[in-house]
Amino acid sequence: MKTTMNFTTSQDDVQRFSSSEDLRSFYRHFGCNGLELMPFPYWDGKKELPSACCPLIAPDMIVGVHACCISDWMQKDRDFLLEHYRRDLDFARDMKAEYVVFHVTQVSDEEGFSYHPLHSDEEVILAACELINALLGGQDYPFYFLMENLWWPGLNFLDPAVTRLLLDNIHYVKKGLVLDTGHFLHTNLELKTQKEALAYLNTMLDQHQELLPYIKAIHLHQSLTGDYVKDWLAQPRSLSEDPMERFRQVYEHIFAIDQHLPFTAPGVRELVERIDPLYLTYEYITHNREELAHFLESGSSVFAY
């Protein structure tokens, strides 16, 4: 199993490190083999450049690439979507990434605010399969294409039959799944403790036992924010008409739900060993280098013998 740290080519992440060697030394200190990289545009201080121009990133650092996924996509132009995702897939091929992560979900700003979905899991899955098959068909990509769960309609691991529907309708040979532990926990608003979270995950794995070999990667983190969601839904909410204010509202709300904190409960190591993935990513949202180091120290400690 290869272990990675999530990273982006955004200014927020890049400014934390002085050089490639500084970044490499940092993640190796916590036992990571490399990065799962999200290729945002790189800002050089004057203008935006392609992510490949980021001076911190060398191909030998990159184990996986996380596609820059569009959450509200089902009504968007197909050619636009294919062009958008092919940039990330071509980048992954150029960087010799071993896998790519792709969200299988559909959620608009309004759906995220109201928790009233407009589509069923099956509708999203079948639409995603059509897009993915068009995206990958006729290509010679060498990497695994791994589909990740969220807590919105689509892949959410709530029903093994729906998970199977996704896998059965993808033509790409090197297909698989990413289990994002924190995302799955958001499907149960009653969870209060990491112990309860771990039991909930293991129950899902029991139900998906036949499909466990498809889980090639884990995004390991947790946040127990059911009380926040219940309080949120108890009050009337409205989205601003101003695009920048609307963006702020949506992202503050999403980050309040999905906090990406270290998963440290006794039994986390056994959960990972049960799945036996090829890749494990410590996927955290942090404010600075010091907080990232603290989270990595805490999260990796569950694997110490």
Describe each model-derived feature in a short phrase:
Residues 1-12, 33-37, 61-67, 100-102, ...:
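Hydrophobic faces of well-ordered beta-strands that scaffold small-molecule active sites
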Residues 9-11, 39-43, 67-71, 106-108, ...:
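Active-site-proximal loop/turn and secondary-structure-junction residues that shape catalytic pockets
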Residues 13-17, 74-79, 110-119, 155, ...:
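Short, flexible/disordered intra-domain loops and linkers
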Residues 78-176:
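Active-site acidic/histidine proton-transfer and metal-coordination neighborhood
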Residues 1-87, 304-305:
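N-terminal pre-domain/capping segments
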Residues 53-68, 125-140, 169-170, 208, ...:
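Alpha-helix-loop-beta-strand connector modules within alpha/beta enzyme cores
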Residues 15-24, 46-53, 125, 153-172, ...:
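Distinct, well-ordered alpha-helical segments
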Residues 1, 82, 86, 96, ...:
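Histidine-acidic metal/acid-base catalytic patches
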